[in-house]
């Protein structure tokens, strides 16, 4: 596992030394597995840092990241703590998890559920109870940031794999 840290300046800009993500003594085993895929893992990502999670096939990268989202966490035996901005994910409800932790699947076909790019971008906001005006504003801001303004009314089936991952 490798961590690239932008240093004290980026942490100071966030206003806190509290890690964005903190993993404490995490172990996880899938049901019926002979061995744990994660065992005694300690890892943290400071706020404002850019982190890379690198490892071989089957080393637990996807498992670890899935465990950070209670609503998609795999079944199995887990020990240890996972904290996001100091809050244990075991104590988060679905709304808090959705507001604090995003997850992009490796295969974008598993995450696209709407027919147009605009509706896909608004989907999460709608599920969080955002007003129509807020959805319009935030989709406009995000599409501008990623240069997707011309794509908003396109069918999601016409997007390349890379565009779907955005």
Regions found by a protein language model. Name each.
Residues 109, 115-126, 136, 140:
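Short helical segment in ABC ATPase nucleotide-binding domains corresponding to the A-loop/adjacent helical element
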Residues 155-159, 163:
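Conserved ABC ATPase signature
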Residues 11, 15-23, 27-40, 72-75, ...:
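A short, flexible loop at the N-terminus of ABC-type nucleotide-binding domains that lies
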Residues 88-102, 127:
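ABC ATPase NBD coupling module
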Residues 69:
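Helix-to-loop junction immediately C-terminal to a conserved catalytic motif
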